[in-house]
């Protein structure tokens, strides 16, 4: 089991350099962000049938980055794929309190934010199959 990331990674968000959103398919965008060590972060945004957005593996954005995100739609759902992807979760939940938080296990708490539903169960109930789209990392 991988466990939680180091305490330093679970502290208040810090905005690192990031790209602009790149559209990889209709209703599907990706953004690459940096970290203070040689790994990259990839955030994926999906346009929902409601017109809102699903954010997968959130990256803290600059004000210009958030303006770009909000031009795509209103954030509705945030997916935490696993404990190493929680660095900016509390920041997003504070900025968008209406966000529904999906994660690996309902009831888990990451950085003070509770997972409201199991992402696999929600996708299954919605008859959604997850797969890696061409062009995504």
Segments predicted by a language model, with ranges:
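Active-site metal-binding motif and surrounding structural segment of the metallo-beta-lactamase
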Residues: 55, 61-104
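Short, polar loop motifs at secondary-structure junctions
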Residues: 84, 103-109, 117-119
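Generic N-terminal simple sequence motifs
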Residues: 1-2, 93
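Short, well-ordered, mixed-charge alpha-helical segments that flank or form enzyme active sites
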Residues: 87-88, 109-112, 122-123
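Catalytic core of the metallo-beta-lactamase
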Residues: 2-60, 114-137
């Amino acid at each position: 089991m991988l466990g939680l990331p180091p305490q330093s990674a679970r502290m208040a968000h810090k905005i690192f350099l990031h790209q602009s959103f790149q559209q990889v398919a209709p209703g599907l965008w990706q953004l690459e962000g940096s970290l203070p060590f040689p790994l990259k972060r990839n955030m994926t945004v999906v346009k929902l049938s409601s017109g809102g957005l699903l954010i997968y593996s959130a990256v803290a954005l600059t004000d210009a980055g958030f303006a770009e995100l909000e031009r795509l739609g209103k954030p509705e759902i945030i997916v935490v794929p696993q404990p190493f992807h929680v660095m900016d979760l509390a920041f997003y939940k504070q900025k968008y309190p209406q966000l529904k938080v999906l994660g690996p296990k309902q009831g888990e708490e990451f950085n003070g934010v509770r997972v409201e539903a199991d992402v696999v169960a929600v996708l299954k109930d919605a008859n959604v199959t997850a797969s890696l789209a061409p062009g995504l990392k």
